[in-house]
Amino acid sequence: MGQKSNPNGLRLGIIRTWESKWYDVDKKVPFLVGEDFKIRTLIKNHYPKSTISQIEIKRLKKSNDEFIEIDLYTSKIGIIQGPENKNKNSLINKIEKLINKKIQINIFEVKAFNKIAILVAQNIAMQLQQRAFYKAVLKSAIQKALKSGIKGIKIIITGRLGGAEKARRNSISMGIVPLNTLRADIDYAFEEAHTTYGVLGVKVIINHGEVLPNKTIADTRQIFSSQYENKKNNNKRHFVNKKNFKTSTS
């Protein structure tokens, strides 16, 4: 029997880095992993779908206190921040109440959102839930992704497509998508669409090209983002250029 591995996990430590970046003694690791899961779940439930592409968690220690820094990558800055940062501050209060620790949230804007698998998958799932015809949705998503400059894309949808009595599988692929080439920068995401006919599964696989030796995904992808920060003593916004090269899998 053929065994399929997750393309994101298969490349960890080779061309991809972890989304949780911290170290601790072995006894605390299970507790901290569970805490990270709670934080990610709370953030995903706090905002609508097709909003956040990745959540990065970093743990820092200052004297005896632990400080958590969370980086949110999004294509919709206005929704994340809200009027006068109300949404952002509300999220900070919820997380601090949940884990009883101080946190800081940094927001990075993703410009080329059609290149990110999780955002493409969530957008397809939302349209399917709104009863859009699945073939038109797939065709539109692939055309937009290819125009953004990717090397290849594959989309797989399974379930009762179009309300059919029998579940089936439909896939569309364009370009090159080498899943077994470890140097290939493959972005993979899975999302569910809850319709009146049942649950549809949506898988999106995007190829950004090959990562050369001694290089990382940051050198391959051209998804730039800007950081929006409000200083305490200065009301002006500060923009910091940064490459967004990581994605999350749901």
From Swiss-Prot:
The keyword Transmembrane helix does not apply. Part of the 30S ribosomal subunit. Forms a tight complex with proteins S10 and S14. Transmembrane segments: none annotated. InterPro entries: KH_dom-like_a/b, KH_dom_type_2, KH_sf_prok-type, Ribosomal_S3_C_sf, Ribosomal_uS3_bac-typ, Ribosomal_uS3_C, Ribosomal_uS3_CS. One of its GO terms (biological process) is translation. One of its GO terms (cellular component) is cytosolic small ribosomal subunit. One of its GO terms (molecular function) is mRNA binding. It holds the Pfam family Ribosomal_S3_C. This is Small ribosomal subunit protein uS3. SUPFAM superfamilies: Prokaryotic type KH domain (KH-domain type II), Ribosomal protein S3 C-terminal domain. Disulfide bonds: none annotated. Belongs to the universal ribosomal protein uS3 family. Residues 39-111 form the KH type-2 domain. Keywords: Ribonucleoprotein, Ribosomal protein, RNA-binding, rRNA-binding. Binds the lower part of the 30S subunit head. Binds mRNA in the 70S ribosome, positioning it for translation.
